[in-house]
Amino acid sequence: MTLYEEIKARGLVAQITDDEIIDLINNGKATFYIGFDCTADSLTAGHFMALTLMKRLQMAGNKPIALIGGGTTMIGDPSGRTDMRKMLTKEDIAHNAACFKKQMEKFIDFSDGKALMLNNADWLLNLNYVELLRDVGACFSVNNMLRAKCYEQRMEKGLSFLEFNYMIMQSYDFYYMFQHYGCNMQFGGDDQWSNMLGGTELIRRKLGKDAYAMTITLLTDSQGKKMGKTAGNAVWLDPNKTSPFEFYQYWRNVSDSDVMKCIRMLTFLPLEQIDEMSTWKDQRLNEAKEILAFELTKMVHGEEEAAKAQNAARALFSGAAGDAEHMPNTQLTEADLTDGSIGILTLMVKAGLAASNGEARRLVVQGGVLVDGEKVAAPTVSFTAEQLSKGIVIKKGKKVYHKVSL
């Protein structure tokens, strides 16, 4: 099986511009880039598809370029957005880019020029605006740009001229790296297709040469929602933002209908093994979820942390909640208490288990909250400093555990 056949069989390929892509990546002759706009100080589980694809292609001899969007982040990509992104300072962007690099090195080998990490701020921030309009802007049709899917959602609610330039900036990135780094291919999410075509067309019109693009399937659940978030919050690769235990639990708790797709797309397990696992049913699906969670946690946090997270999760599910060393935790202070105690509703909000007292109240009334294995009988229940000093474990629903101590 060729490399392209494998990534196709894993469901990673959405669409390609030309069949030449197949020969290039199969023969290790692709120098390709994927862009990362550094809008936060950590990558998320949503970046997994891109990171694992870069690793697969590098293992086959292709050369990845991880492009940090230090310049484009100052504009903000409107793709898939209904609002304008928050503007970041140069200092914020530089800090976020440094964090990205540290995390990417767990997936990609940057030694001896096997991969490059570039920052488009190095060329975009020095561009002369008039020259850009004349040399690059003349290659773009406003009519075609307005028909692009990446702008479609924003047209009714308002698209700033700043954001309208994003396609030109991303296209210029490809054009620049084609000239200076021999980059002949761009990969990205399926929602980036219009922007990527802009780059291939710019190279063709300015240089008379061919460049290629391939979009990666978006990681969505069985309901079509993007994966990589839990309770509305991103699942981060930074252990200080999402602990290895929380990260493990996110993947351990994927639905039965999503687990095999995630294993196929995200892990490096052989396809033959995955095909055999696809026949598993009922309780064996839980085993598949453990395999998924362990493999991905190992990839991001290392085998030792993955084993700790798995052992902690197994202990919790077996009822041994006292073994809670690696679960999410909240440390209270005396200032959090009122007259030496704290109510369950306030406690749940402080622990991030509910967005408000009202939500916490509903969970308690519905019988969905346990403390140290005992169902919380009423929303008026409170806990003393003495109880909290020993530590308590709150269980929300069937799968969410949180340790609270004073």
Predicted features along the sequence, with ranges:
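Buried hydrophobic packing segments
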Residues: 50-57, 177, 195-203, 296, ...
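Conserved nucleotide- and phosphate/pyrophosphate-binding catalytic cores
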Residues: 203-406
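Divalent metal-coordination and catalytic microenvironments
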Residues: 7, 44, 117
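Divalent-metal (Mg2+/Mn2+/Ca2+)-assisted nucleotide/phosphate chemistry catalytic cores
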Residues: 10, 89-90, 96-217, 221
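Short acidic, glycine/serine/threonine-rich loops at helix termini
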Residues: 76-80, 127-133, 225-231
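Positively charged, low-complexity intrinsically disordered leader regions
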Residues: 1-32
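N-terminal catalytic cores of NTP/NDP-binding nucleotidyl/phosphoryl-transfer enzymes
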Residues: 21-78, 186-193
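A charged helix-plus-loop insertion that forms the helical arch/lid used to bind
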Residues: 78-94
